[in-house]
């Protein structure tokens, strides 16, 4: 399997790469600096080097994107996943939005609607509280 790990922070990416090398050795994934939404050059370079993916996983990123950036990031993910692939999105729904700190409050329907309009189908949804217990969506 081809695994490509990405992060928008160079120092965090280097830390993750070092830990993966220590744990996995030769089986470690490749690592790329990639911000969402990616600039056109980064996106084209990534797709020139790698195939489309059977699964794309994003955790704790999308709530930091403005509406325009979220749309651009979603377009990138739609391009990155194969036609029968899976997109897994993890976002906190129970914190206050704060544009000054670059966090935007959206409910689960906002995310589901965006990705469904891009051709994805919602297969499953879980809403948990801040400690991981089954919870509810705060509005």
Locate each region found by the language model.
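Short catalytic micro-motifs in class I SAM-dependent methyltransferases
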Residues: 60-64
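A conserved beta-strand element that flanks and buttresses the S-adenosyl-L-methionine
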Residues: 57
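Class I (Rossmann-like) S-adenosyl-L-methionine-dependent methyltransferase catalytic domain
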Residues: 1-49, 65-72, 76, 86-139
């Amino acid at each position: 399997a081809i695994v490509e790990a990405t992060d928008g922070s160079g120092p965090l990416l280097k830390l993750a790469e070092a830990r993966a090398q220590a744990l996995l050795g030769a089986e470690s994934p490749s690592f790329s600096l990639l911000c969402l939404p990616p600039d056109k050059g980064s996106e084209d370079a990534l797709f020139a080097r790698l195939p489309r993916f059977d699964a794309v996983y994003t955790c704790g990123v999308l709530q930091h994107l403005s509406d325009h950036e979220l749309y651009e990031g979603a377009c990138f993910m739609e391009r990155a996943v194969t036609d029968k692939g899976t997109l897994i999105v993890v976002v906190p729904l129970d914190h206050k939005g704060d544009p000054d700190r670059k966090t935007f409050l959206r409910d689960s329907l906002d995310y589901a609607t965006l990705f469904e309009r891009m051709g994805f189908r919602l297969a499953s949804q879980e809403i948990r509280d801040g400690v991981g217990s089954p919870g509810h969506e705060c509005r």
